[in-house]
Amino acid sequence: IQVRMGSTRFPGKIMMKLDDKFTVLDYVIRQLGHSKLLENIIIATTNLEQDDIIVQYAKDNDLAYFRGEVLDVLDRYYQCAKKFSLDVIVRMTSDAPFLDPTVVDEAISKFQETGCDFVSNNIIRTYPIGIDTEVFSMEALEKTWNEAELPSEREHVTPFMKKNKEIFKLYNLENKKKIPIYRLTIDRKEDLEFLRAIADNIKKQPILMKDVYELFSQKPKILELYNDSMNLIEGYNKSLKDDEEFLKKMNKNSKKANFKSFKETIENN
């Protein structure tokens, strides 16, 4: 699970309480604890001092942890996977308190059955945001780590895999039921009231995706708290702008290198 205290829109969000006792991060860990196929839960956080609290949380909860790069999350995953000698990685984010362990297990099963390099339920989205599950091999992660260059590919870990179908064998896990795509993640302070209302109304563990949607059917007023004004891929769009700057710089450096080479050739002749 990639975890850090820093956030552009809502710093410290993962340590916000969803009920009287448990934080957002607690919910993530508890939900994943109900998976039948996950072997280990590892916290992948950063080397920043502000994330010392995450390390202490891992220690207090007897969880394995790793500290690495802040923005190069791909490197963080790769170094973490190497440290723990992982063959298969299931990638999760810590801002999704209602991750569904049955969906996680289905994705892992598909990975095992198909022999694919990468299995996900968000290549073509049919699941809510916040139920995202990505499973990939160490070989796929290592190839991505070696070849991915763009800032968006380094920060968001898996875009390089998704974009290169000729290199990786991909499988998209589709939801059999057609449902509205809501966002069940904490991205802004305004999301807290909505997520707390869900937690307050479903007193069971684990909270499954179907439980959340049944609640919306039974108590539609809860959806009045839903903030759908946010650009769902705001962070990724920012990375794409960084990609443009990166490519401009690369192009500029390439032109300089070509000119230098041309000049040296002329002088040598």
Residue ranges of each PLM-predicted region?
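N-terminal nucleotide-binding beta1-loop-alpha1 segment
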Residues: 1-11
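Conserved donor-nucleotide/metal-binding helix-loop-beta segment in metal-dependent transferases, i.e.
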Residues: 79, 84, 100-126
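Short, well-formed alpha-helical segments that are part of the catalytic scaffolds
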Residues: 10-34
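Conserved nucleotide-sugar donor-binding
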Residues: 86, 133-145, 189-193
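Conserved N-terminal catalytic core of the sugar/cofactor nucleotidyltransferase
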Residues: 26-87
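Conserved alpha/beta core of the MobA/IspD/sugar-nucleotide pyrophosphorylase nucleotidyltransferase superfamily
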Residues: 136, 157-269
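Anionic-ligand binding region
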Residues: 131, 139-164
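Short aromatic-hydrophobic micro-motifs that form the base-stacking/packing surface
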Residues: 88-92
